[in-house]
Regions:
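Short alpha-helix boundary/capping motifs
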Residues: 67, 89-94, 116-117
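Glycine/small-residue-rich phosphate/adenosyl-binding loop
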Residues: 1-50
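Residue-level signal for pocket-adjacent positions within structured domains
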Residues: 27, 83, 100
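Small-aliphatic-rich amphipathic alpha-helix that forms the alpha element of a beta-alpha
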Residues: 37-89, 103
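Solvent-exposed alpha-helices and their adjacent loops that cap or buttress functional pockets
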Residues: 30-34, 91-96
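A short, acidic/glycine-rich surface segment
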Residues: 25-26, 86-87, 110-112
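C-terminal helix-cap and adjacent tail motif
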Residues: 98-118
Length: 118
């Protein structure tokens, strides 16, 4: 969060609101929604379709976790933050310019009733 505070003026307008909420209330978590786990998928250097590889891996992980009773959400905010502040990728331990995407997952707090199969 310190890096985002430092780079606040250079952030795109749509990221300033959530960052400001975190600055005003350190308990707020508009980016990760208090999810217990973060999965970061990245492509190898030299991959033919690195972005598509990351999306496909996340899609399969999403299906797998749903089948195991976990809730998932795609974490586009992390990608937007790294796009706006490239040095933030260092916090993930990835080389700069590495294609990646992230997902949050954990046991859901709520359950949804579904209509029965027909």
């Amino acid at each position: 969060m310190a890096l985002l505070k430092e780079k606040f003026a250079s952030l795109p307008e749509f990221l300033r609101g959530p960052v400001l909420a975190c600055i005003k209330n350190p308990e707020a978590d508009p980016f990760f929604r208090n999810a217990p786990h973060l999965l970061v998928v990245h492509a190898k250097e030299g991959a033919v379709t690195p972005t598509e590889d990351c999306v496909a891996a996340c899609a399969y992980f999403d299906i797998l976790m749903q089948g195991c009773g976990y809730g998932t959400t795609w974490c586009g905010f992390l990608k937007m933050i790294v796009d706006a502040v490239p040095e933030a990728i260092d916090l993930l331990g990835l080389p700069r310019g590495t294609p990646f995407y992230a997902m949050l997952f954990g046991r859901p707090d709520v359950t949804y009733l579904r209509i029965p199969p027909r």
